Curated annotation (Swiss-Prot):
InterPro entries: AlgH-like. Pfam families: DUF179. Signal peptide: none annotated. Belongs to the UPF0301 (AlgH) family. One of its GO terms (cellular component) is cytosol. NCBIfam families: PRK00228.1-1. Coiled coil: none annotated. This is UPF0301 protein Sden_2674. The lineage of its organism: Bacteria, Pseudomonadati, Pseudomonadota, Gammaproteobacteria, Alteromonadales.
Length: 184
């Protein structure tokens, strides 16, 4: 299977009632060892500004109330992950695409609270991870649909609308799909 890095995983309706119900996950890494991604449409009810204040970091910049901390996934829920535009690289940054970098070091949080903030960012606690061949099996089991990610879908779409808009990118009504089709 080709790498799904820089793709979105869209939860199938069959995941309703689970942790991943109507989630959209931005895949940051995918290779023969497994995969890692960040849920980009599940706010936890805490603004980024409030998080910075809790961490005793300056919040000089006027952060939008729309800048919410996300549940990135069930793995390491106390660890922060920041998806951001690549204007600058911080201590622990890795490019995911030409429009998105993943940073896990605290220095980016200092920048987010200042005039040095990246133009686009999402802050998440935790990540979603898959061991070797686990994601491939979940795809074969019709747990996820995939589309190529875009800057607009990753950064610009409202959290509540992202799952619906991402499913529309597929070109069909996701509610008409059966989880039992496509495999012999």
């Amino acid at each position: 299977m080709d790498s799904l890095k820089n793709h979105l995983l869209i939860a199938m309706p069959s995941l309703d009632g689970s942790f991943f119900e109507r989630t959209v996950i931005y895949v940051c890494e995918h290779d023969e060892k497994g995969a890692m991604g960040i849920v980009i449409n599940r706010p936890i009810g805490l603004s980024v500004e409030a998080l910075l204040i809790q961490m005793d970091l300056d919040a000089e910049a006027n952060l939008s109330d729309d800048a919410q901390v996300l549940i990135g996934g069930p793995v390491l829920p106390d660890r922060g992950f920041v998806l951001h535009s690549p204007e600058k690289v911080w201590t622990n940054s890795e490019a995911v695409s030409d429009y998105c970098t993943l940073t896990t070091s605290r220095d980016i949080l200092n920048a987010i609270g200042s005039a040095d903030a990246p133009s686009q960012f999402k802050v998440a606690l935790g990540y979603s991870g898959w061991s070797k061949d686990q994601l491939e099996q979940e795809l074969a089991d019709n747990t996820w649909l995939t589309i190529k990610a875009s800057s607009e879908l990753v950064f610009d779409v409202d959290y509540e609308q992202l799952w619906t808009l991402a499913t529309k990118e597929l070109g069909f009504d996701i509610w008409q799909l059966s989880s039992q089709t496509g495999h012999c």
